[in-house]
């Protein structure tokens, strides 16, 4: 990574690529007990949040990620009532989850309270639901939280984490997935951000293998654009306890969803279920 008076550039070693943003100034920086969080003002992308030098989100394009990590899973589940979000400290995923009126409770557990406080200050539009009566914000270890979750008590677990290094490393292994499996009801869904399907298919396969070792039997990886992330193309992966689940979704409900989105639609959901041939081949779909 590098910065000068005009640009912030993140070098992403796993893909041998870099991404940069023209900046007009640095707004804030805080070193939490876990990581360094920085906020920049860009000239074209609104505000930019970095965690340990890695781009987390911008004002301009975060909706792709937040909508795709939440709505496909929520419309795939027959009637989601209790949702747990592990990570997600910027609160954008929580906001999308609570757009669904059938959700009765959404617990967000992020290890670093400072991420949420910085988001409330610089990305208040993402924090509209923080005081919703259905929302519970916890600042604790997500691995421990899932390990202590009551068996069969959760409809959807969303793992909205940073890359699998540092504080998030424990969210990408069999032990954590076993905790998720135990906490989910029989028709429950696990969904996790799964990096770039263009450059990191091996990592996606490793994730799915670890999920399978934990008991999950069916998987679906959904790609979507994410300009501020390496390669500009990202993904989430859904996992089900059911054998040969087709991940069909409640299309009528999605079409008549009754709330606004900037990217997600029922028609888009239908299309994204069909993986590009090179992705399908690599993932054995």
Swiss-Prot record:
Tree of life domain: Bacteria
Pfam families xrefs: Spermine_synt_N, Spermine_synth
Domain PABS: start-end pairs: 5-241
Major enzyme class: transferase
Positions contributing to S-methyl-5'-thioadenosine binding: 35, 110, 141-142, 167
EC number(s) reported in the record: 2.5.1.16
UniProt key word Membrane: no
Residues noted as binding spermidine in the record, renumbered to the chain: 66, 90, 160-163
PROSITE patterns: PABS_1 (PS01330), PABS_2 (PS51006)
Pathway per the UniProt entry: Amine and polyamine biosynthesis; spermidine biosynthesis; spermidine from putrescine: step 1/1
GO biological process: spermidine biosynthetic process
Active site: 160 (proton acceptor)
One example GO MF annotation: spermidine synthase activity
Alphabetic keyword roster: Cytoplasm, Polyamine biosynthesis, Spermidine biosynthesis, Transferase
Family assignment from sequence similarity: Belongs to the spermidine/spermine synthase family.
Role noted for this protein: Catalyzes the irreversible transfer of a propylamine group from the amino donor S-adenosylmethioninamine (decarboxy-AdoMet) to putrescine (1,4-diaminobutane) to yield spermidine.
Subunit text: Homodimer or homotetramer.
NCBIfam families, per the entry: PRK00811.1 (NF002010), speE (TIGR00417)
Name of the protein in its database record: Polyamine aminopropyltransferase
Taxonomic path: Bacteria, Pseudomonadati, Pseudomonadota, Gammaproteobacteria, Lysobacterales
Encoding gene per record: speE
